[in-house]
């Protein structure tokens, strides 16, 4: 399943998101959700322990001035990669 986090993790039921993640799922951080990719925050630590890959939309990282502050555990992607993720996963959950 592809999970997409559009909102800031501080304004989301992040505990519910973590509970619903399964091995093999992927999470895409976009819009204000990219703030979860900033190195050293508590949400990133929780994502590191999840059995998933985490991506962040590069355009949103740039728009928020976060490109130099994200963790190496986060994979920056462009819109083409975003489309590939949506094609890969038949089911999606937006947060």
From Swiss-Prot:
The keyword Acetylation does not apply. Disulfide bonds: none annotated. Keywords: Cytoplasm, tRNA processing. The keyword Cytoplasm applies. Pfam families: DsrH (PF04077). It is found in: Cytoplasm. One of its GO terms (biological process) is tRNA wobble position uridine thiolation. InterPro entries: DsrEFH-like, Sulphur_relay_TusB, Sulphur_relay_TusB/DsrH. PANTHER family: PROTEIN TUSB. Heterohexamer, formed by a dimer of trimers. The hexameric TusBCD complex contains 2 copies each of TusB, TusC and TusD. The TusBCD complex interacts with TusE. Part of a sulfur-relay system required for 2-thiolation of 5-methylaminomethyl-2-thiouridine (mnm(5)s(2)U) at tRNA wobble positions. Belongs to the DsrH/TusB family. This is Protein TusB. It comes from Escherichia coli O1:K1 / APEC.
